[in-house]
Structure formats: structure tokens, C-alpha cells
Amino acid sequence: MEGALTARDKVGVQDFVLLDAYTSESAFLENLRKRFRENLIYTYIGTLLVSVNPYQELGIYTASQMELYQGVNFFELPPHVYAIADNAYRMMCSELNNHFILISGESGAGKTEASKKILQYFAVTCPMTESLQIARDRLLLSIPVLEAFGNAKTLRNDNSSRFGKYMDIQFDFQGVPVGGHIISYLIEKSRVVYQNHGERNFHIFYQLLAGGGSERLASLGLERDPQLYKYLSQGHCARESPISDKNDWETVCGAFSVIGFTEADLENLFGIIASVLHLGNVCFKGDKQGCASVPDTHEIKWIAKLLGVCPAVLLEALTHRKIEAKTEEVICPLTVELSVYARDAMAKAVYGRTFTWLVNRINSSLVNKDFTQKTVIGLLDIYGFEVFDKNGFEQFCINYCNEKLQQLLIERTLKAEQAEYESEGIEWETVQYFNNKIICDLVEERHRGIISILDEECIRPGPATDLSFLEKLEEKVGKHAHFQTRKLAGPKGRKRIGWLEFCLLHYAGEVTYCTKGFLEKNNDLLYRHLKEVLCSSKNSILRECFLVAELENRRRPPTVGTQFKNSLSSLLEILISKEPSYIRCIKPNERKEPSKFDDFLISHQIKYLGLMEHLRVRRAGFAYRRKYEHFLQRYKSLCPDTWPHWHGPPGEGVERLIKYIGYQPQDYKLGKTKIFIRFPRTLFATEDAFEFSKHQLVSRIQATYKGCLGRREYMKKRQAATKLEAHWRGVLARKEIKRRRWAVQIIRRFVKGFINRDKPLCPDNEEFVVLVRKNYILNLRYHVPKNVLDKSWLRPPGILENASNLLRRMCTRNLVRKYCRGISAERKAMMQQKVVTSEIFRGKKEGYAESLNQLFAGSRLGVSTSSLSDGILVIHISPADKQQKGDVILQCEHIFEVATKLAMLIRKEHTVRVVQGSLQFYVSPGREGTIVFETGEEDQVYKDKNGQLRVVSAGKKT
């Protein structure tokens, strides 16, 4: 906000508290004008928001704007309706108390739009879950439905609320909107049957005709032209260009679907709306006796069809009146005038009760079935102060309501604030203001107020008229300073007050009321005959609106004025129990033109809204005050002396706290029970410090809590591990005991078997013998002889001697068998020779035993001869024995016979070699010689000079 002060000459100040000439009304007005010209429609007076209706779209209600104001301190950004909404929401969440936002101002000042913007802000910015999305949508879409049935175009406002509305938005402990509740006040039923020139009936009638499908209109017996219906054509502005009835109809139908209206509900609802239009077109004609009749019953038939009643009974109820006299019932015909009254009374009653049913139906869809405690923010959007050329009973009630709200504002701001300073002992210069309690008492005082006088006149015996009511007012309250009639006024006043009028000096100025219709509208009576017809309706909505029990109740119902007074009292009780926020709406001109600033009109509103008095109180006062207990409870974490608990008096704790924070003497005052902080910036700094401290505390609490959870989890796991370990150790111990018991039994059986091992097989040694056998067999497999020459054998136990011998023989046989199967034929022959040798020489010749391990060699003898015709034969002897001479060289004539017999003798035919050229032979071990075979002329054998033996053959062998 401070950044905007540099541009204050052009756009004014954002807070009227910053005005230098804060006591000057002209300076106030000029600041408002500067901001209005720059399209800055919002200005603060402290925490009160002043809003000027721009009559145009400004583009300041976007989602980005909502996000900008979300969670920001109140004065950090320019004034906005979102700031009021966000401040109320944050205060509600932090302090868990209920709030309400009071939006006040003249009709056409923008109250309804302000309430819609606040509702949209809550819907968009509040935390939301998918399951609560429906509740939020229903809350939002209830607004266009209520506007369609309760708003209308007036001379001053195209969308004027013709009923009072208080809406509670319910939030859970997390700040999530979970539901809502709506209370309606005094819908202007007279508008159903009559509108001033330039005004319209309720929007829903025009929306149905403009947007309803052809089939729907045909089923309701309606035409699209509103001018065809008397109840819609009296204002001569049925089709108003700024209002798009067709688009609004689509919005309303979509809202009905989201809120949860069934098709049957809509059929019955639109049937009632259509029946009201048909009622307005019912015409009456009087006969010679003055009795009314309906010449054309076309409309009657449609009404009967739509409401589900008998046409004949309905016609009789509109033209006759049933009078009960003790035990008799008398039906009297009505005049045309009374029939018109009955028709209009029926239309008003049907529409008024249907509107009440609609509000209750919406409430049932908004109700939250969770009965946990909730906080609420209330939105009060109620008709503004109205002054027309001709003001009737409705304007009287509306302006009385505004007087009560003005009184509430005075009580909660001007009067209460100054009284608080005095009671707390704070030095204060009293600000004078007009207290409108005197006007409220004039209207509502019991037995002496205008409403009480009106009720007395309605119920007194004898003919009561509007004139007699005016005379009674002159008699009872004629001396009141704020009441005037033509008879009581001076010469100047008589010119502006008619003979049937009285004038009240309201807080907003003088208003003249015409008493014509006061008694009728206050009674709001519906003939019993018509009630009976409506109670018999087959329309489910009407059956809920008109109960048969009403016919049995003979007591006179409360008048409209009394009902309205009681409902206002209940409303004020609701508002007093909540923390307030205020929005004061100002209408810039009467013509609804953008950028037009009417100084006189705005100055008048500034005066009667009490803005100057509020500014003076705010300028001289303190921006924030709180009881010591609450202040200390909230901010005690900022001071070590007060955290976590302060055990002394709260006042001393607060004093210690602000001293530690560093408050300057001019920033605050300490009262008897409260602390008063003068400047918002001081509170903001404290709140920022608290937020920082809160984050630190939260972090510490989280760490401690997580540590606690971790320790708890660790101890849990440790106990589980200990228990698991104990159980496992028990399992292992039991297994060990079982194993040892088994071992003891085994050892015992083993010892017993060992002792009895030599006895015949019996139970005492059976297991031992089996074990010994098993072990012996297992060990024997690793000590079996590898060949037939290996005579080793594992020594058997005594009990296995026989088995061991048997196994040994089997093993030996197996080895011999394997050896025999693996011997070659040559070796077999050699072994056979060994057998023959054994038979010849064993025990007879020395050296035989040493020769046993020597195999007979097949190559020990060999025979060689040449391929020539010589008779040379060489017998080769193995040179292994060094004592032997060399090979034997023979020459014989019968070489073929000798060689053959030698070969047969050694059984090796291949031992005889036939060589060519030469052959080698051993002369002695280690010394070789050579025989060379060649041919010549004659046979000869000689040794050449090289020492080689040469054998010459005269011819080749043949």
C-alpha cells in the first residue's frame, strides 16, 4: 500500500485513514472521485471497504487476481473485495470463530455482485477435494436460481434483489467449504401482480417464455410474447435489452441439474410459474346484482390442469367466499373487485410459498451430513435503502430493515468501539454520530411502534381503512420528531405530503409512504375457500406448501409486518454472535451510466452511511485490539519467557512479550483487559514473526514427533527381534537337547552292542552289527586290491571273518577274470609257454624261479636271408645279455627248409626277413657288422678292405 502513496495526487489514497483532511467531506468526496475516474472502485476505511458501482466490466475478477490476494496480509495489496473475503477466511481458520460479511448500500449500488464475487473467491481459492466438488458447485449455482426467482428489474437496478438473503458457508477444520445454508427474508410478493412503469416482474417469468422449448411452452399453455400476460406487461418493459433472458434460462436450467432437481420437480415448479401467468389473465364480469363471474374459462382450465385441481371448484373459489358460522357454512358470491383481490392473493400466496419451498429445497442439497463442529462465514445480501416517487408497504419494510442493519453497524463499530476505549481506560476524544435507535424504536417498539399500530388496526372490530390507520398513527406517534403527516407538518411540508401519506426521517433521509394497501398487504389474507382448493392440489410442491393442518388451525396467523420484525431480530442475533467485516456499496448515479460521478447523490450516501464518522473513529482509534489471554495464547511462542506456558497474570505476560518483540510506546496501549495496537504494520510484523516462529516450532515438533515415531518403531522392532531371537534360541536349544538325547541313546546302544558283539545276533547287538557291517563295507571299497598280484586285504572284525573271506575270494576271481579278459592272444600264447616251462623246469633246474617274472619276448630270435641265390642265413639273438656273443651266420645248402623250421619253431612266420643289398648283424654286444649281397660270376664269400663281409652269388634264386 505504501508504494501507491507516490501516485496519490492522481489516483487518491487507497485508505481514507491516510487523508490529511480526514474531517473534510469534500476531501473524502474528491478522493473517491479520483479513484473512480481511474476505475479504482475500491477504497478502505481501515478494514471497512467502500465500493463504488462502476456499471461496467473492469477485468479485476480473474483467477490470477484471486491467486494474488490469497493468503496476503490485508494492507499489502490495493483494496479489493477479495481482500475482505481472504481476511475473513484467514481469521476464521486461525482463530476458529465464525465471521460474517455485511454488504450494505442503496438499491443498485452493487451489493448482489459483491456477494457473488466473494462466493466465487471462496469456491476457487479454498482447498477442495473431489468429493466436496459437488457441494461447492451447488453453493455457487444456487445464486442464479435464487436470482431468477427473487430478483427483478427496477427503476434503479436491472438485477435488484426483491428479497433478503443471508447465506452461511460452512467450512471444516481444514478450511474446506463443505456445505451451506440460506435464510430468505420477505420476498416482495406484490411484484407478482403489479409493477411500476419501467419495472419488470421476477426474472423467471421472462426466462421461461424466452428460453423454454416450444414443447414445454405448449404443455404449459404459454406463448412467447410477454405482452400477452397482464402480470408481465404492466411495466411496459418486458423485453429489456441489457438482460438476456434466454442465456439466463440456460444458466438456471444447468444450475437445477447440478443442485439435484428431478424432472418431476421441474415439471411441477414450471407448472406453478405458468399457472401464475394464467391467473393474471383471468377476467371477471359483474352481473346486475354485482356478482362476479368468469365469461371465458379457458385460463381456468389451464390453471386447474397445471395445479392438479378441479376446474369447477377453482372457479367457485375465485368468485365466491366460504363463511363458517358455528355449525354452518355459507357461500357468498364476490364482487368483481373482491374476485380480483382473491385472484391476486392466490397468485401472491402461490408464488411466495413456492419461493420458500425453493429455498428449503436448495438448503437440503447444501446440507452437510457430517455433524462435527464447523466454522462459518455468513454473507448478508439484503435489499438496499429505497426511495421511489411512490413508496408503499414494501419500501417501508425494506427501509426498516436497513435501519436495523445501520443500527447493528453503529453498535458494532462507532458506539461499541468508543465504549470499549472508555471501559478499558484508554484516552479517547469522543466522536459524535447519529444513533438511529430512535427511528428503529419508532417502527418496532411494542404497543407503540408503527408495526404494532398497524397490527392493531388490522385486527380491530369494525371497518378498518388505510385512512383510519393514518389517523391512529397521528394519535399515537404524531409527536415523534422523526414522524410527519400532512396534518402535522408545517406549511412547507404539506406540499410534499399527501392526505394518505406519512413521512419518516430515516438515517438516509426523508421518505414519504402512501398508506394505501398497508392493511391489505400486512394481513396478506388468502380466502379459506382458495386455501382448500390449493390443499387439494395434486402438484407435489403445492402439497408441501399448503398443508391440510392449516385448515384446522383457527388461530389468526401473524401479520407480515410482525413476521418480518421477528425474522430481523433473529438475523441480528445471528450476526451479533459472529465477527464482522463490512462492505459499503455506493451508487455513483441514477442512470446506471459508467464513468458518471454524481456528487450530490454520492455525498448523500456518504452522509447516511456514516462513512465520515467511521473514518474519524478509525483515524483516532486503534487498528487491532484483543484480550490479553487471546493475544498471549497466539503470540507467546515469540518470547522465551512466555513459551511454552505463562503462569502469571495475562497482562504481565503480554507486557513481557511486547517488550521482547520491540514494540514502541506509540505503537500500542494496554487497557484493563486488552491490548490495543494502533498501526496495522505493527500487527503485520508481529504476524510475520509468528509465522516464522510457527514454522520453526512445527519443524521442531515434526522432528520430535518423527523421532518419537522412529524410536517407537525401533523399540517395536527391537522387541520383535528380541522375541524372535528368544524363540529361535529356544528352537535351537530344543533341537540341541533332542540331538543330545538321540546321541545318548545311540551311544548307549553302541556300547551295549559293542559289549555283546561276539554273541549271536540278538536285539542287544543287532544295530551294532549292522553298523559294523556297514562301516566295514564302506571302508573296504576304498581298500580293494587293484590287481591279482596285490595280496593286501582290509582286516575284518571277528564277526565278519566269513563274510570277509567270501568277499576276498570273489574279489580275486573278479580281478583274475578282468585280467584274463584284457590279455592279448600273443601274451596268452606266451603265458601258455610259461606254463609248459613250469611243467618242465619247476623244481628241477636252478634259476627257474628268477625267470618267472621275465616274459618270453617274441623278438628274442630273428632270421634274415638275402634275396639272392646264396645259402647265407643270419640268426639274430637279443643283445640284452652282455655275456652272449653276437648273431649266428650260417651257410647251408637247404636254406629254405632250415628257415621254415625255425619260423615254425618260434611260431612266428613273420620273423624271417628277406633283405636286398645288405643287412646289419651284431658281432658282439654293442658292435655291429654289415653283410653286403651282390651277384658275380661265381659264388664266393670274402671280407673287403672296409671290414664288410661280401657274399657274391653267381645267379639269382628261382
From Swiss-Prot:
Keyword field: Actin-binding, ATP-binding, Motor protein, Myosin, Nucleotide-binding, Phosphoprotein, Repeat
Domain of life: Eukaryota
Domain TH1: 773-955
Tissue: Highly expressed in the central nervous system, including the forebrain, midbrain and lower medulla. In the lower medulla, it is broadly expressed throughout the reticular formation. It is expressed in the retrotrapezoid nucleus and the nucleus of the solitary tract, as well as motor neurons of the facial, vagal and ambiguus nuclei. Expressed in neonatal inner-ear organs.
PROSITE patterns linked: IQ, MYOSIN_MOTOR, TH1
Region described as Actin-binding: spans on this chain: 568-590
Residues the record lists as binding ATP: 105-112
Pfam families named among the record's database cross-references: Myosin_head, Myosin_TH1
Gene3D superfamilies the record matches: 1.10.10.820, 1.20.5.190, 1.20.5.4820, 1.20.58.530, Kinesin motor domain, Myosin VI head, motor domain, U50 subdomain
GO cellular component, one term: myosin complex
Residues with PTM Phosphoserine: 365
Residue stretches making up the IQ domain: 694-716, 717-746
All residue ranges annotated as the Myosin motor domain in the record: 12-691
Entries under CDD domains matching the protein: IQCD (cd23767), MYSc_Myo1 (cd01378)
Family as reported in the entry's similarity comment: Belongs to the TRAFAC class myosin-kinesin ATPase superfamily. Myosin family.
Task performed by this protein: Myosins are actin-based motor molecules with ATPase activity. Unconventional myosins serve in intracellular movements. Their highly divergent tails are presumed to bind to membranous compartments, which would be moved relative to actin filaments.
Name of the protein described by the UniProt record: Unconventional myosin-Ih
Lineage summary: Eukaryota, Metazoa, Chordata, Craniata, Vertebrata
